[in-house]
From Swiss-Prot:
UniProt protein name: Major urinary protein 11
Source species: Mus musculus (Mouse)
GO BP of this protein: aerobic respiration; cellular response to lipid; cellular response to testosterone stimulus; energy reserve metabolic process; glucose homeostasis; heat generation; locomotor rhythm; mitochondrion organization
GO cellular component terms attached to this protein's record: cytosol; extracellular space; nucleus
InterPro entries hit by this protein: Calycin, Lipocalin, Lipocalin_CS, Lipocln_cytosolic_FA-bd_dom, Maj_urinary
Span of the signal peptide: 1-19
Family stated for the protein in its record: Belongs to the calycin superfamily. Lipocalin family.
SUPFAM superfamilies tied to this protein: Lipocalins
């Protein structure tokens, strides 16, 4: 009987933990909970050169500020070993949970998975000059995340057609942590 009770408790715990995850396109998504400080952990793209050193999309997220119909995103970039700050405003689109921002083309993005307290996974599609590419980012409240979360992110990338060799772990890269206020 004790073993059955223990298994029931374990099962309920797993259900509760799973229920805490949300997607920006789902009904249970609370955008207010993504407000605050974040760190870029991993970037992935079907055009790897966009996220390699000096790539235009090698951006290091510092903060998300939630407004009524938009998000203010504060990033840092590294060019020639120098950190620069970059802020942009992403506006809600007509699609549930989708935002758009103009940066090196027109971008739309969603947040397919987040638990609000530890990680956020974003999926972006860029359109420029008739060409498109996709980018995915794993962001954490702390400067690094567990290997389990990183593996879940890699699997999500594969589900979107991004190969593992196009996934770059930036947890040991210069992410301009010293430039944070």
């Amino acid at each position: 009987m004790k073993m059955l009770l223990l298994l029931l408790c374990l099962g309920l715990t797993l259900v509760c933990v799973h229920a805490e995850e949300a997607s920006s396109t789902g009904r249970n998504f609370n955008v207010e909970k993504i407000n605050g400080e974040w760190h870029t952990i991993i970037l992935a793209s079907d055009k790897r050169e966009k996220i390699e050193d000096n790539g235009n999309f090698r951006l290091f997220l510092e903060q998300i500020h939630v407004l009524e119909n938009s998000l203010v995103l504060k990033f840092h970039t590294v060019r020639d070993e120098e950190c620069s700050e970059l802020s942009m405003v992403a506006d809600k689109t007509e699609k549930a949970g989708e935002y758009s921002v103009t940066y090196d083309g027109f971008n739309t993005f969603t947040i397919p998975k987040t638990d609000y307290d530890n990680f956020l996974m974003a999926h972006l599609i860029n359109e420029k000059d008739g060409e498109t590419f996709q980018l995915m980012g794993l962001y954490g409240r702390e400067p690094d995340l567990s290997s389990d979360i990183k593996e879940r992110f890699a699997q999500l990338c594969e589900e979107h057609g991004i190969l593992r060799e196009n996934i770059i772990d930036l947890s040991n890269a210069n992410r301009c942590l010293q430039a944070r206020e």
